[in-house]
Amino acid sequence: MAIDSYCIPNFSQTIDNRTIVNIFQSCKYRSQLSVCFLNDKSAADKFSNSMRQGSGTITFIIHAEDGEISEQLHSTFRSVSTMLLCGMQLFVFIVAPRNVISSETGKAITWAFRGSFIELRDHGRGEQALHDILEQFYRLSPLVNVPKMGMAYYGPTSFAELLSLSSKNKTSWRYVIDYSMFTRSALVGFASHMMDECSFANKQINVIGYNPPYVWAGLRHGVTTRFTEMSTPDPEGYGPIKLILPRLTGNVLLKKVKYVQHDPQKKLLCDDSVMFALSRNILYIGVYPATHLLDYNLKGWRMVAVDPKINAAWAETLKQRTSIDLVPISAKFEFNAQSTRDIVLKYFSGVPFSIIDDSWVEGTEDYEKFQELKQSYFEQLVMNGSTSKLRVSMISMKWNRTKDVKCRRLLALLPQPYGGSLRELRAYFHVNGAAEVNIKKSEVNSYMDKFTSLSISEQIGSQKFMHMLITNYGDALKLKTGRDKAIIASYSLSNAINKKERVLKFLSDAAKSETLIIFGAPNLNRVKFMIKSGIVLGSDVTISNDLITFKNASGKVWKDYGYTQSELIKSSMIEITIEQMLCISSSSYNGVGYFANSIYNDMFSWYVPEWLFEKYFSIQDIRLSPVALVKCFTTSIRNLCYVPHLTYYALRGSFVEKVLITNNVLNSSYLITGTSHSTFKVLSNFEVPSPAGVLKFKAGDDVNISGHLLSLVIAAHFVASPTLLWATHMKRMTTPVNLPKNLDKLLFFDNKIKNGMLEKWHSREEVVLAAMIVENYVAHILNGRHSIEIIQEITQVIYEKFNA
């Protein structure tokens, strides 16, 4: 049948605001991809077929029969990249041994496409356990990809709970929490990875703006956390910092940050997280079993563990799982001069250290006497802590007293976030604690009655009191910057209390001093486009100049300044996506994944300093490639509008021809081809003026303009799109580049490699010419529902980067 026999629709017939809104909404579930590595081809065949038939899952199988899988990776993941917004589960089986593709490389590739990494190569062919796991994947489809890009998960802990949330209309807010918690975890993982790459002497992160999971995420990545807050409400307790029995219904907890719970079985998690964040030298009394520490990366910490229940096997497990420098002592700590001499001074003489106490004895009367002994010992230890040999920083003591108690050097007496039913408190002794304070049993009883009456969520929120011990108060824009300094400023510095000029100067100074700083803020132009398209209601988000006012369903209102890419570029900051940061650190990431994104999160963009980019990210591999981001948007729109492949590429050729005609290029100098491999052929030499300088075309050239750039501009209307990062890579790849020797060659499967060189992608002319048609191109594809600001900002970056 001839092409003329078909009725071919065009974009203007089908693209309206509803189409734009649908694309934004499909972004919530973008990349429903799982990639499973296994050794059993027959199992892959069987379950691939079952998942296709049972749930409509789109499946692929890569089989490394000859030990080479680069071409299969290229063809498979190029196909996957077009389907990431299709709303269907994608499942790739890769049957290859680890000597062909390592787990580390497999994870990096999977996460580059925002997928779930599944490693099953520890199971042999035909093994029943393997079939049981794959059978479960088949039964749970399409929920197999929970979570994406992470090992643990913050959100609902079971599929049943996830589904029940949907019926209660709670999923929308949960998605915002889900992805924002993933974001914080990913930022910590990336910062930790780069601190190692940069050989930081001090692995401490300054986090601007309080949010509880940063502490937990930090310890999973071997870093300590310090928060910086402008101020905090009065805790309304006793003592020098008002944290002795702080008020449970006061402003501190009323203004607590919403977040998803940790494992409620791990009651010591919050207290120990704070203590390990305070010091890298820990004396842990009554440590056994310490299962809550096993997921931490404690490399760089030293812990003297004292407990009669510990043995060599326990110690070996803890060392292997956490990489901690462990001194196990299988004995009782006697809380006397001998313990001080034999343990404290022996291992901590002249070294700052902290003590965690979780020891106890059976029997109410005996336990009370035991606590008296401990309290007296700890008070004396703290008061002697100013000596050169004994430098105790903080002591956390298990507290469950049965009578009135007089304390010295008590800094805080706090409820345990997960210990409400135990009616147990934590006492913190410090040299700056109260000189003397009376703790009445009746007051403690009343306090614990109030605490146990709180909801579980409210009890868990009380960990904010503990986190006040690792919070500094003051102007975040006066933080010290420079080498060996790491700062995370996401969802915080953009707050309206921080004037934009000061923030941009702070970022500029930080970047110039080679501070490892990560900045996240609303993308002003994308938020404007969201409002214009009706994806966010005017009652929920409003803009006045560059000030954005947000209002959530509960009525809470907050204001942030929106930032543009061009503003951040002037401050030497380069945009990079959260997922790209995570791919870079995938080999060491030990944080959480996510199930779904949210429209709110897609309002934000993140930036890192230019010096970091130039030093570590100057050559693009799949981890930084836009291939997993850009093509799916254009493909989705094409499919919504039934625009044929032939028509789409002919359209690009038509726009290019208009540019050539406008610039008085003779039509005898070129031949428009308009295919996916060629835009036009040059028949005789000609030049075209452009904002980036003169473009020169030579007879015989086969010109293929950059489709990635065109697709990137479409994507930038919907999600964070790192234009400068990609443009810098693109300019570098206008000539062949040596294949980096320190990276797995498979990370470059989307490149053409010849004689150890990465072949060039596009010429300067092909990129700039694409930029010259991009406004008309996007206006046509989005049927006039595009953002001039987004387009102009991107093209300006291209012109400046490629200026001759």
Swiss-Prot record:
E.C. number(s) listed in UniProt: 2.7.7.50
EC class: transferase
CDD domains the record matches: capping_2-OMTase_Phytoreovirus
Location of this chain's protein in the cell: Virion; Host cytoplasm
Recorded GO MF terms: GTP binding; mRNA guanylyltransferase activity; RNA binding
Reaction it catalyzes: a 5'-end diphospho-ribonucleoside in mRNA + GTP + H(+) = a 5'-end (5'-triphosphoguanosine)-ribonucleoside in mRNA + diphosphate
InterPro entries in UniProt: P5_Phytoreov
Entry keyword set: GTP-binding, Host cytoplasm, mRNA capping, mRNA processing, Nucleotide-binding, Nucleotidyltransferase, RNA-binding, Transferase, Virion
Principal subcellular localisation of the protein: virion
GO biological process assignments: 7-methylguanosine mRNA capping
RNA-binding found in the keyword field: yes
Keyword RNA-binding: yes
Pathway(s) per entry: mRNA processing; mRNA capping
Gene Ontology CC terms: host cell cytoplasm; virion component
Function description: Enzyme involved in mRNA capping (Potential). Binds to GTP and might have guanylyltransferase activity. Together with the RNA-directed RNA polymerase P1 and protein P7, forms an transcriptional complex positioned near the channels situated at each of the five-fold vertices of the core.
Family (UniProt): Belongs to the phytoreovirus protein P5 family.
Protein name as catalogued: Putative mRNA-capping enzyme P5
Organism of this sequence: Wound tumor virus (WTV)
